């Protein structure tokens, strides 16, 4: 139905499609289903599960890096060239934890991830999430600043009309970040 309606592709979650925590045989089943679909799936969202924390006092960098490496390798195999890093549960800053330190943890993760993504032909796009879903990297301007800080072509920006409308972001911030855009979500408030 989506193909008949004129859609070009569909977007599915990393956790449901690429399944970085699952055995290769489980991923192979999902891959076969996607390959049989009438539309391709070049983009995956929901990158990190909520229990794989990127911020806070207990972050397992080795587990994050292994998960990300598997996700990127499977993305390449599946023809996925863009992975959306919204992952509000994973990046949520724990109460009382230093926000600047949390942003530094996210930047460090993205810097480690960038060469892995690049090696597999994948671009990671940071998704600004409205304040009701996450307490860090909520605006296009904040995510654009982080994208520039990481400074790697494998890390770009997603813009989502729903989140920017909910946050009441000025259109000038959206326009200023436009050179960093790789992907867009369209929804209404």
Residue ranges and their predicted role:
Residues 56, 94-98, 128:
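Short amphipathic alpha-helical segments at helix-loop
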Residues 1-82, 111, 118, 152, ...:
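N-terminal pre-domain/capping segments
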Residues 9-10, 44, 107-189:
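Acidic/histidine-rich catalytic cores of soluble enzymes
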């Amino acid at each position: 139905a989506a193909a008949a309606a004129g859609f070009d592709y569909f977007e599915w979650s990393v956790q449901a499609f690429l399944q970085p925590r699952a055995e290769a045989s489980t991923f192979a089943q999902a891959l076969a289903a996607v390959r049989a679909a009438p539309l391709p799936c070049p983009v995956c969202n929901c990158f990190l599960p909520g229990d794989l924390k990127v911020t806070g006092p207990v972050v397992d960098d080795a587990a994050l890096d292994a998960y990300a490496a598997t996700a990127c390798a499977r993305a390449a195999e599946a023809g996925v060239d863009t992975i959306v890093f919204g992952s509000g549960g994973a990046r949520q800053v724990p109460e009382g934890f230093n926000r600047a330190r949390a942003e530094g943890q996210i930047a460090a993760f993205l810097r480690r991830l960038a060469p892995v993504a690049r090696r597999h032909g994948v671009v990671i796009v940071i998704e600004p999430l409205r304040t009701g879903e996450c307490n860090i990297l909520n605006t296009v301007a904040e995510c654009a600043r982080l994208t520039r800080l990481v400074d790697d072509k494998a890390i770009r920006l997603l813009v989502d009309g729903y989140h920017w409308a909910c946050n009441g972001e000025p259109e000038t911030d959206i326009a200023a970040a436009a050179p960093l855009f790789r992907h867009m979500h369209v929804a209404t408030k």
